[in-house]
């Protein structure tokens, strides 16, 4: 049996739950399409045991296999949206904090030099 990488053995519970939900949803999508595991696995280019592991939400199944399953159900185009920077509110907050920190208090002389003496009068 292959050794489990350390990263997979320490997944946060929320990630484990999310993967199980994704696997269950993909299994439901396959069943609603009245496809057998054998046929679906063949369409995906994987073995039936790998398909079963994916449908169980196994974190050891490659992202590419999950992506192929999403593509088969017409949801492949949603993958880039998962990490779209415009939805990364934590990074935006860090950017704002860094910008505020960098903002230096300017002396009147430096403001005059930057804006020109005429602008202040």
Which residues does each PLM region occupy?
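Short alpha-helical DNA-recognition segment
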Residues: 34-52
């Amino acid at each position: 049996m292959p050794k489990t990488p350390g990263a997979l053995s320490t997944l946060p519970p929320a990630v484990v739950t999310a993967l199980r939900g994704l696997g269950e949803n993909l299994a439901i999508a396959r069943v609603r399409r009245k496809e057998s595991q054998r046929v679906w696995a063949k369409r995906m280019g994987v073995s039936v045991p790998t398909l079963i592991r994916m449908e169980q939400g196994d974190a050891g199944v490659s992202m590419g296999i999950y992506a192929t399953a999403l593509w088969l159900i017409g949801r492949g185009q949603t993958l880039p949206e998962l990490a779209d920077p415009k939805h990364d509110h934590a990074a935006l907050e860090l950017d704002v904090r860094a910008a505020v920190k960098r903002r230096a208090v300017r002396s009147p002389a430096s403001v005059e030099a930057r804006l020109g003496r005429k602008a202040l009068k």
